Structure formats: structure tokens, C-alpha cells
Amino acid sequence: MAKRVLIVDDERNIVAALDYLLQRSGYEVRVASNGDEALREVETFRPDLVLLDVMMPQKSGYDVCRRIRARPEWAGVKILMLSAKGHEAEVSKGLSLGADLYVTKPFSNAELVSSIRRLLGEP
């Protein structure tokens, strides 16, 4: 059974590229364009991993991360934060809120897929 990945980003081009990349890499993918949608999708889709952009309308990726980590039933969901903000303070904030990994944009496709596989315990 394919692992489930939820992509959360408000930029359509990034979502389309990530969706294509991850489906070709064997993942079942759903997308959300804002924080509220993301939380609904985590509830219904039950992803193994959330690929979470930091800067979004309504709720930031930080807010979404905090809310996911506040729910014991979602404790096993891995969170990989993506952001153009690569300053040490932003990375530290994401990790302290419970993100498993923080990757800065731009990133290589191979690096991203490798990071996802590692987080999901795949070879």
C-alpha cells in the first residue's frame, strides 16, 4: 500500500510540481491550499506525512504544525516543513513546534524525495 502524503501550499505551480513528483515516486497524494483545508485533510485523508509550506493565508504552516501536534491521534504523522525562509530562527521555530524536518527552497527533487523516504522509514 502506498504511503499517503498531504501537500499544503498556496502556490499552484509548486503544488503541481510536487504532486507530479510524489505520485511518480509512488505516493498517494492529496493537496490543500491553506491551513484550514490542511487540518480537514489530515482528519479525513490520514496522511503518513504532511509536506507543509510555512507562508500561507489564514493559518501559517507554524499554526498548522502546532495544531497537528496538539492532537494525540495525529502523533504519528510526520511533518516536513518547506520554506523560502531559511534563517536559523525560522528553522528553529518549525522544529520546536514539532516539525520532523525543515527544508529550505529551492531544493532538489532528489533531496526532497530522499528526505521523505527517510522520514517514512523507507529504503
Residue ranges and their predicted role:
Residues 71, 85-86:
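Short, conserved "switch-loop" micro-motifs in signal-transduction and mechanochemical regulators
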Residues 107-117:
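C-terminal output helix
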Residues 56:
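Receiver (REC) domain active-site loop signature in two-component systems and cognate sites
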Residues 12-30, 119:
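Two-component/phosphorelay signaling modules centered on CheY-like receiver
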